[in-house]
Amino acid sequence: MVIGTMTNLENQLHAQMVRAIEDVKDSKKIGISFSGGVDSCLLAKICQDLGYDVLLLTMGFEDSHDVEFSKKMAKMLGMDHDVEIISENTFSDVAKKIWDEINVDNLSWNENCIAFYYVAKLAKKHKISKVITANGIDELFCGYNAYRDSVSDGEDAVLDMIKDKLDNELRMMKAVNKIASEFDVTIAQPFLSEQFIEFGKTIPLEHKINGKDDLVRKHIVRKLAMSIGVPEESALKLKKAMQYGSLIHKNLLKVKKTWNMNF
């Protein structure tokens, strides 16, 4: 771990991430929800450096971006990895089942619950009862493209958006865990802990986003990732949300009319 190359703020962020992960890690073997993007690679690398017994878990339709990219990044990290390929034959029924269970007319919530259904299913196959995710990083560090619009309205507008997105994410992850419980799996989010959120809010905005034309964002997260050995290809990769990278979004829009889904 090349801690010496970090700035003081990056060191603080790293220490807070380690602490947050240690607070949720209570089983011998853990799964990590893994797309190969900077957030999940950073989470995986920290767990690897801590000496944890880890399996990287990816889901997606065959030949989807996340399936292919995650394989490449897992190999570069030298970590164990497995992939759950979503069956086109059963996807519609799974989507309907989750729609009924969470009873929320929100496209993103349904997409995420479907994604974690397959992650939890894969974890169960490996007798893993806890899966750790990097949810919270995009919310706290301006990962979403929408932050480019709010930054033009000033810092207060960005801070309001951070709060709103965190509130939504915390509520959504309760629905995710409801779905994952079918497989006796808990989905843990260390970067949505109260302590980590409070720390994340103290990091100056210029370390997160540099104006309305900033296509990269999450700058301190990306720098930290490269400092501890995350492949540059992942660390500098632009955001592609789980539901798009896995092709869940595309396929859910295809089946929603079948079930009269209102989103």
PLM segments and residue spans:
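ATP-dependent adenylate-handling active sites, centered on carboxylate activation for C-N bond formation
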Residues: 3-228, 242-254
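Long, continuous compositionally biased terminal/linker segments
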Residues: 251-263
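Acidic/polar loop patches that form or flank catalytic/metal-binding clefts of enzymes
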Residues: 209, 230-237
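Generic cytosolic/nucleocytoplasmic N-terminal low-complexity/intrinsically disordered segments
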Residues: 236-239, 255
